[in-house]
Amino acid sequence: VSLLNSLSVIAAAFTGFIILNSVLIIAGSLVGASGLILTVIMCKAMNRNLYDVLFKSFGGDGLEERLTRTKVGSEPEEISMILDGAQKVIIVPGYGMAVSQCQHQVKEFADLLSEKYGTEIKYAIHPVAGRMPGHMNVLLAEANVPYEQLIEMDEINPEMAEADLALVIGANDTCNPAGRGDEGPLAGMPIIDVDLAQTIVVVKRSLAVGYAGVDNDLFYMDKTLMLFGDGKQMITDLNSAIKDS
């Protein structure tokens, strides 16, 4: 997407040369260059080169994967009881948080835990979470999340095993253990090691696969609890359950 965006404004820059419009030339060159840089950054974050992204399959074999496994959903009240006494909680935001626009509810959730239980809160940020690098940072900054709580993937991974609970909000491929394997569309892709946390809570509409078309084993682990539904509604209900507990 970022490459196509950059090519579109580069075309605008060439149009500027044709009609002798310096504004189009300058603006097109600047935005086009930034788009190309963004493309390179995202390729590195996915451990892929540009050729593979453009000409090789990344979303499976094109056939919809049939999910034969099931997982019983949990209730916000159950999650709130687990959170009572949690010393460290790591929040892992993904594209689903952006879609549901629940960053303010997530900030309220973090504040409730800090004030009520004295819980240490951190946010694990994957380089390609969302639609572009920095997408999650922008959304959380909008909700006034302290910058020092936003931790990049490489820095937060060593801490995941220390977390009493990891809350995954709308993330899928970026925390799929299949990234550690040697085969499949996600092979070799850096991931957030959510599966190392003591307890895992995933807020997601369903068990559907992510962009790569790969089922996520994280969802079916015994220590994983699923909150099925809209992100904003689920976090709002969870906040209410914490207040009432």
Can you annotate each of these PLM segments?
Residues 1-8, 42, 140, 155:
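Aromatic/pi-system hotspot detector in well-structured domains
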Residues 2-27:
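Transmembrane helix-loop junctions at the membrane interface of multipass transporters and ion channels
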Residues 3-11, 34-38, 167:
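Membrane-embedded alpha-helical segments of transport systems
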Residues 14-17, 37-40, 242:
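Structural signature of transmembrane alpha-helix termini at the membrane-water interface
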Residues 17, 21, 29, 33-36, ...:
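Gly/Ser/Thr-rich helix-start
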Residues 26-86:
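Membrane-interfacial segments at transmembrane helix termini in multi-pass membrane proteins
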Residues 67-245:
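Structured cytosolic domains appended to multi-pass membrane proteins
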